[in-house]
Amino acid sequence: MFFPNPEERPYKLPALCEEVNISIHEIELDCVYCERQLYRCEVYDFIFRDLCVVYRKGKPLGVCQPCLLFYSKVRQYRRYNQSVYGRTLENLTNKQLCNILIRCGKCQKPLCPLEKQRHVDENKRFHQIADQWTGRCTQCWRPSATVV
């Protein structure tokens, strides 16, 4: 697979599979960071998290789980802007939470409306990192420690 023309490159994995006529279950991608071939479960996670395919020298690349977690943390430390509560975020953007793209700060999955509502209900903040809003998905959510 080689795409020299940027205008012809599919940036979502299902579109790439369709373009090259390969099943999602058969496509092979390398990691953009460590260059290791993605495991099948990482390919499925890539689709589930609605991540974009990147290209280096015309070759499509994804991201493996360890690199995704590592570089998400690096991005959090280097590109942090601010933290706000749900109501404040709605006021800042003039949009309802359900209409704002908020990704999990750890795994990068887009948050569903219930996950966004959980932040509001539990009085947790959303974080602006590299001008994108993040929170925590259900899978990555860690409840705060309670003293018994």
UniProtKB/Swiss-Prot annotation:
GO terms for cellular component: host cell cytoplasm; host cell nucleus. One of its GO terms (biological process) is regulation of DNA-templated transcription. It holds the Pfam family E6. It is found in: Host cytoplasm; Host nucleus. InterPro entries: E6 (IPR001334), E6_sf (IPR038575). A motif (PDZ-binding domain) lies at residues 146-148. It comes from the Viruses. One of its GO terms (molecular function) is DNA binding. Forms homodimers. Interacts with ubiquitin-protein ligase UBE3A/E6-AP and thus forms a complex with human TP53. Interacts with human NFX1 and MAGI3. Interacts with human IRF3; this interaction inhibits the establishment of antiviral state. Interacts with human TYK2; this interaction inhibits JAK-STAT activation by interferon alpha. Interacts with host DLG1; this interaction leads to the proteasomal degradation of DLG1. Belongs to the high risk human alphapapillomavirus family. The cancer-causing human papillomavirus E6 protein has a unique carboxy terminal PDZ domain containing substrate. Plays a major role in the induction and maintenance of cellular transformation. Acts mainly as an oncoprotein by stimulating the destruction of many host cell key regulatory proteins. E6 associates with host UBE3A/E6-AP ubiquitin-protein ligase, and inactivates tumor suppressors TP53 and TP73 by targeting them to the 26S proteasome for degradation. In turn, DNA damage and chromosomal instabilities increase and lead to cell proliferation and cancer development. Belongs to the papillomaviridae E6 protein family. This is Protein E6. It comes from Human papillomavirus type 34.
